Amino acid sequence: MLKRALCVMAGLCLTSTAFAESITYVLDPLHTYPSIEFPHFGISVWRGKFDKTSGTVVIDRAAKTGSVDITVQADSVDFGLDAMDEKAKSDDFFDAAKYPTVKYKGKIQFVGDEPKSIVGDITVHGVTKPLTLDILSSKCIEHPFYKKEVCGADAQGALNWAEFGMKMSSFGAGDAGKTLLRIQVEGSRKES
């Protein structure tokens, strides 16, 4: 009897693994913030975040695969200083009127059972370049308020403004143009 029960349980486990599916998480714009930081003539560091972000993360834990598709509104950049915000939105920098979005699409890479990086492409100022984001932390919980699964992560990568054709790139040539991009995300499991 015990042997039969174990066989049935093993069969159920194999069946559930065989039919594992991808789960889509819709990013919560109130808890998702890409941020950038870069040198200001080498004497200090400017830090800003983007307030309007949307997108999805798809994960298949059994297959250890996943994808990310994120869109950021370029005119939502906020450095905490109106003059810098306007400069960043102008045609010297993001040129948000002409290029209203920053886009990132990538594939999630697993190490063991954990997602550890995203290998993808970022499009800024109409220029697309490869960008790998290292996942610093990630966790999923049954959210106490939403009563459904919510996942969050913190990731970062490096890019260089000089590669994206911005007029201000001349001030950030070489190492001076290096920028740290970080993104904190939270997403709710999409109902099927």
Model regions and ranges:
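Bacterial N-terminal signal peptides that target proteins for export
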Residues: 1-6
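Short, linear, compositionally biased motifs with a strong N-terminal bias
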Residues: 11-12
